[in-house]
Design a protein with these regions (language model features):
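Long low-complexity, intrinsically disordered regions
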Residues: 97-194
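Accessory beta->alpha helical hairpin/"wing" motif in late/C-terminal subdomains of nucleic-acid enzymes
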Residues: 3-37
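Long amphipathic alpha-helices with heptad-repeat character
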Residues: 76-97, 152
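Short, flexible/disordered secondary-structure transition segments
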Residues: 2-6, 61, 193
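Detector for Asparagine
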Residues: 3-6, 24, 55, 74, ...
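Leucine-rich, amphipathic alpha-helical/linker segments
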Residues: 24-84
């Protein structure tokens, strides 16, 4: 909130914060402002980034990091570093002051190696191959992956509204490419359970 000419006005950070439900809105607002509203990320990089918020659970022995991997690249790695720093900052504040805001501070990197293959898959066989790899490598089944992709789409839709509110047209354009990139094969907006 800001006091402008004796009236209370919601700041840009506040607009972002209230527009985000699928991941931590406080973290999202600071992160988006710090990294210039994802201007350096491609649509594919945004999809990979959003996959970190999908609440996929895998066994500790198959968990994936993100540092220095071919599927991350320097730009995305920088963004994830910044995101992790901001997450840690707010989590530490909650712990220090014994707060329980109910906000989530958990992110994962287990889908990062598979998102590019999914996005670039052109046919049923390539999509099926990605699904088999997810099951074999991570014990992530089709239904879980469908839910994860739908969550990525929802995050994109939330950010579309935020981008419209704060007039970030270039971000809006790239966000609108997400559904076409991820909703294919067994995954559609109508997918509830496979």
């Amino acid at each position: 909130w800001a006091n402008v000419e004796n009236s209370v006005v919601l700041t840009e950070k506040g607009h972002i914060c209230i527009g985000i439900q699928e991941w931590n809105g406080v973290v999202a607002a600071e992160f988006l402002q710090k990294v210039g509203y994802l201007e350096e990320l491609t649509t594919l990089d945004m999809i990979k980034l959003f996959s970190c918020f999908t609440n996929i659970r895998v066994s500790d022995d198959v968990k994936t990091g993100y540092k220095q991997h071919k599927f991350t690249g320097n730009t995305l790695e920088y963004h994830i570093d910044e995101l992790q720093t901001i997450y840690n900052k707010y989590n530490d504040l909650e712990v220090k002051h014994e707060l329980n805001t109910g906000l989530e501070y958990e992110i994962h990197y287990d889908l990062l190696p598979y998102m590019e293959d999914w996005v670039t898959a052109d046919d049923e066989q390539q999509c099926s191959r990605v699904l088999r790899l997810l099951e074999k490598d991570k014990t992530i089944f089709v239904g879980e992956f469908v839910k994860a992709l739908l969550k990525i789409q929802t995050i994109g839709l939330e950010l579309e509204k935020v981008a419209e509110d704060i007039n970030h047209i270039e971000l809006l354009k790239r966000l609108r490419e997400i559904p076409d990139a991820i909703l294919k094969y067994v995954v559609t907006t109508q997918s509830l359970y496979i």
